[in-house]
Amino acid sequence: MKEINIIDFGLMGKQISALFYLLGYEIDVYNKSKLNIYEFEKQIKLLQRKIDFSNFNAGKINIYQHIEDLKNSLTIESLNEDLNLKKEIMQILRDNNIVFSNSSSLSMDDLNCDFIHFFNTIYIKLIELCGSNLERFTPLKDLKKLGFHIICSKGNRGALANLLLFNEISSFFKIIEKYDY
């Protein structure tokens, strides 16, 4: 069975974990606090309604509260956008794992690792990749089978979709200001 580590079980961590679980991976999730597995099950059901996983068999999930217990494996970091916390976790993981960050606001230079950014919600089927060792992200083949679109970017700060979103938000506030809402 293919294996992948997911660091943190927040908004994106749950979605990424459910996606790879449904793709048949053994998911090793690290989260400091105890997980609500019901939230994971809800995410699985939602993804099954949105994406056809009929060509895949469900995987397995293991949950760890100590990062040292994770297996040496491909790892996706999906922590909150806290640079110091991300750096601390990356330092622990980097020796024995291939680590990709799902950060949407930091740059590759900030974390010194490659990025794989899944968009929220994950069933949008859009992934932004940036880095110099992208061939090490072996699940791309499975994601492409599901119809995910892969964008390779230069790794500027913030994901491409976030840059579009910030522009929309800025336009929204300009309209409010202009028309005195």
Q: Which role fits each region the language model picked out?
A:
Residues 1-54, 62:
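NAD(P)+-binding Rossmann beta1-loop-alpha1 motif at the extreme N-terminus of oxidoreductases
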Residues 13-15, 84-87, 106-108:
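Short glycine/serine/threonine-rich phosphate/pyrophosphate-binding segments
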Residues 32-35, 49-94, 98:
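Rossmann-like NAD(P)-binding element
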Residues 17, 56-74, 143-147, 152-158:
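Amphipathic alpha-helical segments at domain termini/boundaries
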Residues 151, 159-181:
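Active-site-lining helix/loop region of Rossmann-like oxidoreductase modules
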Residues 79, 98-163:
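Rossmann-fold dinucleotide-binding core
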